[in-house]
């Protein structure tokens, strides 16, 4: 009877050790998306692709942005080992200014917090700068 209890106990310990070895790992194709120079009102949707390189299901529990002008969207479903997922980021391109924002991804991966970045510049080509107006007036004379 003691041998049976010992065998069951050792089996349970080895099972729990094996269960702890499995971990999800998140690997992004890139951690920065460059919008470049885009027009005011242009499509502000960009995608961050990632792969679960671990051996346990990956669950992205929360994605936040450093500004309300950037809205992230992601799947709540677990990403199985070896499979890919995506985080969609929509920037409000009605704001004419440089883009420098951080998107924070929280998951059950071995690195639970990952910072992604978007950068670029939104311009309004319908508005001419003072220098452009001055140059045009000199050419016309």
Descriptions of predicted regions:
Residues 20-42, 49, 110-141:
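Long, low-complexity ectodomains and other extracytoplasmic segments of secretory-pathway proteins
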Residues 50-54:
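Asparagine-centered strand-capping/turn motif at beta-strand->loop junctions
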Residues 1-23:
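Bacterial Sec-dependent N-terminal signal peptides
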Residues 41-47, 94-102:
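Short, solvent-exposed loop/turn segments enriched in Ser/Thr/Gly
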Residues 92, 106-110:
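Beta-strand-rich extracellular modules
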Residues 83-89:
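Short strand-edge motifs at loop-to-beta-strand transitions and within beta-strands
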Residues 55-83:
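Surface-exposed binding patches on compact interaction domains or structured appendages
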